[in-house]
């Protein structure tokens, strides 16, 4: 193997000996790649195939950014997912003095009639995405929207707005332009580093036919090295008899049942080295493809199938955890790459620090109670992160200035709903709109499962349910 590597390396060096714009990358098969695209050998960025039947998957091959590709949408389509997996791509760009992950997102998506379904540089969409502490921003009128932060492996799934839910997905030949932020840095001003028109992506398009689905297969990976109250290590074989785990599963299932989805749950173990590496205080401050969380998600390759992968760890470490605010769950991307197991974005991570907490023996016996029953709290976190993976955004973000693109989820805008003490801070990053401020007709959404803060209330709206049931993960 050492001799073979030397021969391959020599061949790669011969391919680009004089170009200052490329480097040989051992971690990517000794390919000649743009600077910044080569990552350490310990960073796995696998390209995988969809687990869905061939009739749902259009594999379009590997293409350079800037390439416009056609794809076909059948007459009975309910949703479309455009999936880009980096073959060669840098990790970050610097835009207006901010370091951003090099996210993959279609530059444009074109309807069969030639109209534009999505334009990543649409000024009207950019204006609507700006902070709106008065609640005046309305993303629901756009056919589809993009939430950002989808480096390396990205799914762009629609419908995800009221407009696209109402109008559906027209039959015919669509087009989209392969793209990432590095490519856009060559097209717009404001980028000081990371721009490149040489990124290459493996591209697939998933079409999910009507009717909407009603079943979701969920894989819980026990990464945390914890013991149950009897002193036994929590592992997949004893999860089915663990009272707290089963309470968590029942509550999780009830949250999906309200929108007509049956959650079928399985538990899997990981090996001791994975538990030691990822299981305790997993750092999620950064979530690029080479970070620990994203590398953990590649463990889902062990089980082939169309799963919602949820990784259970003892706790999360994040710079966003300050004072009484703790990060307890995080998704790879919104939405996730449904049916693509084993990528750096194939799942969500959940803290089970409170799994065995209860204020009394009766706390976990009745209705869902995330305050007094730790298993219910874990269920809420898991369902919330699954909602993100299926395409749902927060109903209201923590500053009370950004809202989801659905008309039947109430807003809680800062200028109307924050406390008198917080109101002068509206329009900055300082206010945090608590759920208690968002429980009225004019200031709502605090009891929705997708509110930004873990708080009592697991409601899901009709349109949220539609987005979830149209995702290719739900069958």
Model segments located where?
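Non-catalytic, beta-strand-enriched accessory regions in extracellular/secretory proteins
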Residues: 48-83, 88-97
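Hydrophobic helical h-region of N-terminal Sec-dependent signal peptides
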Residues: 5-13
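Noncatalytic accessory or regulatory domains flanking protease catalytic cores in secreted, cell-surface
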Residues: 63-71, 108-195
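The catalytic-center signature of Zn2+-dependent metalloproteases
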Residues: 278, 363-466
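Active-site-proximal segments of metallohydrolase catalytic domains
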Residues: 262-372
